[in-house]
Every structure is written in structure tokens, then in C-alpha cells.
């Protein structure tokens, strides 16, 4: 037999209640001495050795729902099985209890004083009885495990059938709902079309009536306008004849006076305009020459910057083969150069706009100089474009060299 009284079988534990306290088997009898034979003590008639009393487990406390289930299972009806004479098995959903009587060991008690029982229960008989009981218990537990598995399979099959039924119901209901929704939409569309037709017809009738009224009012207005126009023409023709006589006399006097005033004003204004035109012309020419010099100076600076950039490019190509850390500083300098070039592009665009506005105001004498400046501007644009293309080529080469430099370091 097992020396430990706690035996736990995982094959039958559907509610995960953990180990249970099984029956305590009697310890092996001590070896009897030759002189005084020692008989095993009679087993006390206590009510039950419960298999299902839970040991003090170190696990965390169960949920309240599980404790309620345990209480309900304790109240559930139990089944009594008499395995052998003097050995009763009581089981329910949650626990198994065993009752051992005196009949199991077939002992005879003698109440006479000084006389010991002559019947001696051998140790091998007790062990064989207990082994038989354990085999019967294991068979019962295996049967219960089989029953539990079959019940679980039945429940799973029922759940599958219910799920299939629910899916079919859901599909049929969804189809019916879609059909009803489609029919309702069609009804609403038809009703909406009918109402639109009715409203359209009513609106068309109103438009026809209003058109007729408008034509009638228009004809009446034209007639009234013609009558008023005739009356006004008669009145104005009379007054006009009178006014023309008076105005002729007054006009002649006023025209003579105004003629003298206008001639004096015109002479003064013409002199002032000539002076202003000369001043503005001189200022425009000065500004034009100044801006031209600035543009030429900026163009020379751009050429110098391009030469410096080319030199820097050669230096960078030489340094990129040996150093990878200098790339960050060169990238920043390139970024600043790009910003400066973009600023210069914007300045060149602004200057072009100013040139166009000022050259439009200048006279035809300076058309040749304007053409020269436009040609210079075009050349500047081409150079700027070449600069941008050179920068793109330089960036591509720098990217290629930067991608090649880590490979060099890895090698």
C-alpha cells in the first residue's frame, strides 16, 4: 500500500477541486514475538472516512460562484453502493465517502474476561482485501471518467447542432430583413417619384400663369411708356428751343473767359510736366544703371561662388575616400549653399520683375540696352540652371560616395 494517505487521480476531477483525502489504510503490523502473539486492534465504529474532505491547499481562494456550486453539490442526492459486507461506498456529484464496518474484517469479540480471541486475521488477508477494494474503486472511477467524457462529447455535439441552427436562423432572418428593406426602399422611391411628378406639374402650371401675366404687364408698360415718352418729347422740345437761345449768349461769354484761363494753365502745366519728366527720366536712368551694375556684380559673385563650389567639390571627393565623419559638415555647408542659391534665384526673379516694370516706362531709345540686359538675364538663368544641375549631380555623387564609404570601412 501507499505510505502517504493523500492520493490524487487527475482522470476524474471535472470541477478542478484539487486533491482529496482518501481513506487511511492500517499500517503494517509489527512482527509478533514468539512468546506473546499480538493481534490487531479492533477498528472503531466511527461513522465515515470521507474521501472528499479537501486538504488544506496552498492555492488561492475560489470564486463565490464555485463555492455556491459546492454547497449545491453537497445538498445533491447521494448514491449508496455496498461493495462488500462491511464496506459501503456513498457518492454524489462532488464527493465519495467510504464506511468500514466490523464485518469487513470478520472479527469476533469475546466479552469474557481473561480470554483472548482465538481468531487471528493475517496480514496478507487484509492486504488482499484492500487491494481488491482499491481495484474496484479504480474501476468505478474509470467508469465515471468514461461517462464524463461521453457526456462531454454529447454536450459538444449538441452545442455544434445549436450553433448550426442559430447560424441558419440568423441567415434566414438577415435575408428576410434585406428583402423587406429592399421592398421598403422601392416603395419610398416610387412614392417620391410620384410626388415629384405632381409637384413638377403644379410648378409648370404656375410658371405658365406667371408668364402670361408677365406678358400682359409688359405690353401695358410699353403702352404707358410710349404715351409718356411722347408727352415728354413735346415739353422738352419747347424748353430746348428756349434754352438754346439763352445758352448761346452765355456760352459765348463764358467760352471767351475760359479760353484765356485755360491757355495760361496749359502753359504752366506743360512747363511743370516737362520739368517732372526730365527729373523722372534722369532718376530712372540712374536707377537703371545702378541696378545693372548690381546685377553684373552679383553675376560675378555667382561665378566666383561656382568656382569655389567646384574647388570644394574636388576637395570633398578627395576627403570622402579617407574620412566618413566629414560628410555631416559638408552636407550642412551644401545645405547652406543651396539656401543661398535659392535666395539669389528669388532675388534674380524679383529684379527681373522690377526691370520689366521700369523698362516698360522707359522710352524707345533704350530698347537696345533692354535687349542686352534680357540676354544677360537669360544667360544668368542658364548658368543658374547649370548650377542646379551641377548641384544635383554633386548630390548624387555624394550619395554614391556615402553609400560606398561604409562598405570601405566594413572591408
Curated annotation (Swiss-Prot):
Compartment(s): Cytoplasm; Cytoplasmic granule; Cell projection, Cilium, Flagellum
Coiled coil (residue ranges): 124-220, 278-328, 355-385
Record key words, sorted: Acetylation, Cell projection, Cilium, Coiled coil, Cytoplasm, Flagellum
Domain of life per record: Eukaryota
Biased composition (Basic and acidic residues): 61-74
Chain positions found as N6-acetyllysine: 353
InterPro entries linked to this entry: FLACC1 (IPR026674)
Stretches the record annotates as Disordered: 52-77
Recorded GO CC terms: cytoplasm; cytoplasmic vesicle; outer dense fiber; sperm flagellum
Keyword Glycoprotein attributed: no
PANTHER family: FLAGELLUM-ASSOCIATED COILED-COIL DOMAIN-CONTAINING PROTEIN 1
Listed name of the protein: Flagellum-associated coiled-coil domain-containing protein 1
Source organism of this protein record: Rattus norvegicus
